[in-house]
Every structure is written in structure tokens, then in C-alpha cells.
């Protein structure tokens, strides 16, 4: 196993830090390690090959995970250099350090979740059917969740915000999102009057659905004043959407005071925010 040593420093005064590198250089693995360390996820930490991972925060707090043998499932967990950490201290740390992970492609079905509402389903059979459908296409569950939440003022405000952000990215599709009869639907633009039917979210293209789910996660899942790990958000998106993506992400982050670490290999994403990128170059390649 080749050794890769990375020292990644986030920009302290910036909302977004971009990890930019080729495929296979460990971007996704690094994000998953950060997530696992923050939660002390024993299963995940046991599955990764590493010697030491250390997270250092602006307030001086320090978390480290260390293995004597990289492929060993056993590891030592340190908080501020202290090895013998009480379970209560770890739980306190978790509550004060929230991480939301948004992974690309197949991970989306696993990571996109929706609050359970007792009045969302009329019977157990419908719940079972929808659980199966959500595994295949979470946009269907999102559609039903939105229907349930539109009557709650705070949630409706977030849904309106989701609608507005998506509409900023949708002009090239000749459609926009509207709330009609307590449904969030895709509606043809006015100049296309011959197309008078609205579209449910689940019949939109994979890229359109991906965009909606991604911004849903940022608005509804990410806790205020927390860290968001965003992995390869460019997947399935047109180049123009890739170029505009981070400006939309920044609007949400400013409102919720989030810090985002983005892993990408898309030049379209990096070109507008070149000054925020941190190249992932292994120590052995540095001169």
C-alpha cells in the first residue's frame, strides 16, 4: 500500500473550501474519514486503511484517530490529546460538532432522508410501498414530504427558498417550480403555452432531480453553524449548472452559517472559485 500524506487547511474566513484533484486521489475517502471521525463511527473507521487522521478546529479543539496497523479494525480515539475519553465526552463533542454529508451518485439514496410524520401515510401497506419506492427514487418521498410540510409556516418558508434556488438554475430547461394546490410541481414557462400540463418531480431528468435533492439536503438536513461535506456535486449536471452551483450553495451557507468542504474534479466548478481550491497533492509529489 502506497502512503499518502495530506495536510488540508480550510480557509478560515471563507464559507467554502474546494478539494480539487484527479479521480482516485482520495477525495471521497477523505470526506468519509472526516465524517467517521466526527461521529466516532467504529464500523467506518475500522474499514478504512490509514495510520492517523487528525481534525484541528479554529477554537483549538483537536480530534485524532490513530491505528498501529493501517488495515486494523482497532484504533485509538483522542480528544485534545487525551486517549481515555469517556463516552459522555464523545457524545458532548458530537452535539457541538455537527457534520452533514452529501455524497454523489449511488450514495444519494442512502444519505437523503426525510423526517417521519405519523399522518404522512394512511396505512402500513402504503408505508412499505413508499419505503421501497424511496430506495429506488428518493424524489418521490421528497414530493410527499413537501405535500405534508406546506401547511407548516417555517417549513413552507424553506420550501419557498428551495423553489427559488432551483428556479435560478432552471431557465435553460424552459420550466420552473411552482407550488400549486399544495404540490411542488415543474411548470412550463409562459411562452410555452401549448404545453399546459404540470410535471411531478419524479418525471424530471436525473440532473434536475439531483439538483433538487442536493439543495433539499442543504436546506433541510444541514444544521445551522455546522460543517457540510459535499462530494462531487457536479455528477449528472450540465456544465452551466456546474458553473453556477457554488453561488447557489453560498447563498444557503451564508443564511445558515455553514462551512462547506467540496470535493470535485470539475474544472467548471473550480474556474469561478479558483482562489478557494486546495489541490490534493500527496506529499511524495511535492517538491
Set out the residue ranges of the language-model regions.
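Phosphate-coordinating catalytic segments in nucleotide- and nucleic-acid-processing enzymes
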Residues: 40-208, 219
